[in-house]
Amino acid sequence: MPISSTLNQRVRARLEDDDFGHVSDESVSNEALDEGESNEDTEQDNSDQRETDDDDTEDDGHTEISDINPSLNTISFGALAKAQAALGKRKRRTTSTTDITPKRTKVLSRQSPTPSTSSNKEHDQGQGLSEFQKHLASNAKKPPQKLTHRTSKHAPTIQSSRHAVSRKRTILEPLAVPKPRDPRFDSVVLSHSTNGDPSTAANADIHARNNYAFLNHYRTDEIAELRKQVSALQTKKKKTERDDHEIVRLKREITSMSDRQRAFERKEMEREVLVQHRRREKELIREGKKSQPYFLKKGEVKREVIAKRFTEMSGKEKQRALERRRKKVAGKERKEMPWGRRGVE
């Protein structure tokens, strides 16, 4: 055995301090040679040693004890310490190379089995580790991405690309729901009623408005008649519950008809503002003061309509309009205030 041979070579008569350094150097060199030879032969003799170790354990046990027992009395403590240190290093190297590598190969064979050869064993192990790490990184759970909300209600909605598409198909389209329409104000009917004149067909809405302008006069007369009925019911001496309900209904009808009348008047004023602006732009282009016309925006048209209405109002109407405007602005500001400050003026 190599342990007994090394110990027998070192056993000598007790040396002096000067000669002890020389002997220790020789022992270290012998240990290094033995380690080199053992490391070179481990790969070739692993299979043979595994078979013969079990058979020779009993025979070698008696011989080792007989060889070591008489020599232990003459070995110095320094030599034993060096031998123990050398054996400890050898054990660490063997465990690091023999115990860890099969575990790594087992893990790699489970996760990503790849064929390996004896010549490129270390290279395959390093490559397997990197592939194993990549596999773990790819299979790691990614945090779910939260869909951000829309910046405004007019912005398009955000939807994941993984959203499943519906498997249902519309084989038969549903029937179109019939919508009622008034033929008096339909552009198709009005275009046919102009006797094929293209100028009048293009301005069918204007002609319809002019043809049915008497309806607005009827509406004003109806509002006046409803107000008379409300005043008659209010001045009635003995009013019943039915009369109260009738007054509420008539007032609601008056407000709806008056709102409709005001909306019609506002549209007429907007149309007049646009017509006047187009005339001015045409005159400026005809005079050569402009090369391209300027088209009013909706906000500009609205401001001009308000200014025109304000100039046409009387003194009392202006005060009422300003008071309504003031209350409207005050209500908006009160809504923006905190709840505790709303009641404080």
Curated annotation (Swiss-Prot):
GO CC, alphabetical: 90S preribosome; nucleolus
Record field: compositional bias (Basic residues): 143-153
Coiled-coil region list: 219-267
Highest taxon, organism lineage: Eukaryota
Composition skew (Acidic residues), residue ranges: 32-59
Compartment(s) of residence: Nucleus, Nucleolus
Start-end of Basic and acidic residues biased regions: 312-322, 330-345
Residue spans of biased composition, Polar residues class: 66-76, 108-119
Low complexity composition bias: residue spans: 78-87
GO biological process: maturation of SSU-rRNA from tricistronic rRNA transcript (SSU-rRNA, 5.8S rRNA, LSU-rRNA)
Keywords assigned by UniProt, alphabetized: Coiled coil, Nucleus, Ribonucleoprotein, Ribosome biogenesis, rRNA processing
Region (Disordered), start-end ranges: 1-167, 312-345
Family per similarity comment: Belongs to the RRP36 family.
Subunit details: Associates with 90S and pre-40S pre-ribosomal particles.
Biological function: Component of the 90S pre-ribosome involved in the maturation of rRNAs. Required for early cleavages of the pre-RNAs in the 40S ribosomal subunit maturation pathway.
Protein name listed in UniProt: rRNA biogenesis protein RRP36
Species this chain originates from: Ajellomyces capsulatus (strain H143) (Darling's disease fungus)
Designated gene of the protein: RRP36
